[in-house]
């Protein structure tokens, strides 16, 4: 029986590497997968999943109004798994479409993304994945300032912490830092 998996972690926790690893393992066995990512994430190009260590692959970009269920249902070859990067940027309807892929097409879906934003609010996609996922796993990494587990994301601009502003601002290591709770409120900048 297929399931909807939600695997979340802070920045630099290896979410995209995990997607690429899972895809490789399926494909090594001759089992096709579909890799998708939010159309909002254009850091490394449109429709690209890219890890910070340099591994990258093309992916199907997901817009907020895309009918993911119909897209997967109409593929000529049924995938063995659907892998989603940057799932925090998905709309509520996108997440419900993923649940339908699992329930009606019997295709496992693994969604990877951030849980909370730099203000410690849930992203729309994260909120609905937490509600609908059959299995929820945390991908762990450590705080940039100490050896505790990072549970939050600190946004910085010009070396200063930022706690207000737009929820979505696509960035990389230079803008967002994985931190523990202590260093979120008292960063060593």
From Swiss-Prot:
Its EC number is 2.7.1.21. One of its GO terms (molecular function) is zinc ion binding. ATP binds at residues 9-16, 85-88. The active site is at 86 (proton acceptor). One of its GO terms (cellular component) is cytosol. It is found in: Cytoplasm. Keywords: ATP-binding, Cytoplasm, DNA synthesis, Kinase, Metal-binding, Nucleotide-binding, Transferase, Zinc. PROSITE patterns: TK_CELLULAR_TYPE (PS00603). Its main location: cytoplasm. Zn(2+) binds at residues 143, 146, 180, 183. It catalyses: thymidine + ATP = dTMP + ADP + H(+). Pfam families: TK. InterPro entries: P-loop_NTPase, Thymidine_kinase, Thymidine_kinase_CS. One of its GO terms (biological process) is DNA biosynthetic process. Belongs to the thymidine kinase family. Homotetramer. This is Thymidine kinase. It comes from Streptococcus pyogenes serotype M28 (strain MGAS6180). The lineage of its organism: Bacteria, Bacillati, Bacillota, Bacilli, Lactobacillales. The gene is tdk.
């Amino acid at each position: 029986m297929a399931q909807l998996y939600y695997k979340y972690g802070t920045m630099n926790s290896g979410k995209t590497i995990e997607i690429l690893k899972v895809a490789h393992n399926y494909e090594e066995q001759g089992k096709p997968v579909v890799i998708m990512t939010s159309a909002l994430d254009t850091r490394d190009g449109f429709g690209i999943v890219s890890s910070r260590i340099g591994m990258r692959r093309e992916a199907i970009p997901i817009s907020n109004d895309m009918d993911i269920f119909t897209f997967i249902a109409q593929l000529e070859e049924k995938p063995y798994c659907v892998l989603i990067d940057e799932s925090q940027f998905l709309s509520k309807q996108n997440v419900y479409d993923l649940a339908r892929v699992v329930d009606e097409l019997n295709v496992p879906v693994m969604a990877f993304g951030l849980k909370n934003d730099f203000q410690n609010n849930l992203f729309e996609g994260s909120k609905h994945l937490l509600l609908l996922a059959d299995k929820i796993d945390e991908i762990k990494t450590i705080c940039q300032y100490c050896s505790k587990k990072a549970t939050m994301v600190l946004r910085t601009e010009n070396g200063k912490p930022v706690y207000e502003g737009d929820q979505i601002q696509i960035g990389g290591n230079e803008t967002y830092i994985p931190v523990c709770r202590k260093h979120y409120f008292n960063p060593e900048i």
